[in-house]
Amino acid sequence: MTNTKKILHNALYYVLIIIYEYVLLLVHCLRYFFEFLFLFLPLWLVFFFLMLSLNNLSRSYSSSPSSWLPVNSLSLASLFSSSFCSPSSNFLFLEPLSSELSPKVFLPLITPSGFRSSL
């Protein structure tokens, strides 16, 4: 082999080694990621079902559950804000523009002190 062919052969060899090392690093990272995921999978499931049950509890906390907007974060937030004040003081009553087309909607009103804010 000539000198140029040796240099190209060595360069190709080192490039293949670098690619192999990066693939090996990626495989190890994915392995640790999935080990972490499956190790804490029961905790993820418990957290998910806890949030789901809190969501259902907060939807039933209102006197008229059919008037809630189907937004999970709002209903969860109303559950936590209702622990700071009475249940009737943390709902803002919104009158729609055309009352014959859409029903009246109750939205949870979240303020730092838990009191109703003026619009």
Swiss-Prot record:
Transmembrane region(s): 7-27, 32-52
Compartments, record wording: Membrane
Chief location: membrane
Membrane topology annotation: Multi-pass membrane protein
Keywords linked to the UniProt accession: Membrane, Transmembrane, Transmembrane helix
Note: Partially overlaps YNR024W.
Protein name: Putative uncharacterized protein YNR025C
